[in-house]
Regions:
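Extended active-site neighborhood of metal-dependent phosphoesterases/phosphodiesterases
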Residues: 30-153, 168-190, 196-220
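N-terminal active-site segment of His-dependent metallophosphoesterases
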Residues: 1-40, 165
Length: 220
């Protein structure tokens, strides 16, 4: 899509807000991920696109379903090559603070693709998702969120939304089925996600979490 225009716009905005880091909500390489750490897409779709001075900050990354069509281990391994790209594991966490304030933020990055029940029936996903361990990830999420206390913001980042006003309603239902109770029990403040190719802010009644969807920025 229009990645060059998006990269230029992000650089213009970053000159004003001077971000300390940037978050990707997955589908990092459209349409089929990357093949290896030497895939030319690293250059053509990342390094040469997001090259502005103010974009030379850590990029905190999560995986999307299109990344699963390629080599997800290569995206993890690229963390050892790039000083910006940060994806140490399919699911991971990061503690941040806002400069010159007492505000602390806990980010929990999760891998939502294995929680999409219908992917286990689709040829382009079933072989790779069947090798994942959703129980292990759920256990990790429970333990991780359970340890969070005395922070100003408890934020989770994933790819698939739980709620949407868009067309991917079925996908959202699977995410909600597997994860919403964990968010409720652990008072997650915000869930950043993508998948839908638009921007949405949803706050379901009787739930604490604000859902912020930002997917396919180059299309928006």
């Amino acid at each position: 899509f229009n990645q060059a225009a998006l990269g230029a716009t992000m650089n213009q905005i970053s000159m004003v807000i001077e971000p300390e880091f940037i978050i990707s909500t997955g589908d990092n390489f459209y349409d089929s991920g990357v093949a290896s750490v030497n895939d030319p897409l690293w250059t053509y779709s990342f390094e040469q696109i997001y090259k502005g001075n103010f974009l030379q900050v850590p990029w905190y990354v999560t995986l999307g379903n299109h990344d699963y069509r390629g080599n997800i281990q290569a995206q993890i391994d690229y963390s050892d090559i790039s000083r910006r790209w940060t994806l140490p594991a399919p699911y991971w966490y990061k503690t941040e603070s806002i400069d010159d304030t007492d505000v602390s933020i806990e980010f929990t990055f999760i891998d939502t693709t294995p929680f999409q029940d219908d992917y286990y029936k689709k040829a382009k996903y079933k072989d790779v998702v069947s090798k994942t361990d959703t129980l292990a990830q759920k256990k990790w999420i429970i333990e991780r969120l359970g340890k969070i206390s005395d922070v100003n913001w408890n934020i989770v980042v994933g790819h698939h939304p739980m709620y949407t006003g868009g067309k991917r309603v079925n996908d959202a239902s699977y995410t909600r089925k597997h994860l919403e109770s964990l968010f409720d029990e652990n008072y997650v403040d915000v869930y950043f996600c993508g998948h839908e190719h638009d921007l949405q802010h949803i706050k379901p009644e009787n739930h604490n979490t604000h859902h912020l969807i930002s997917g396919a920025g180059s299309e928006v």
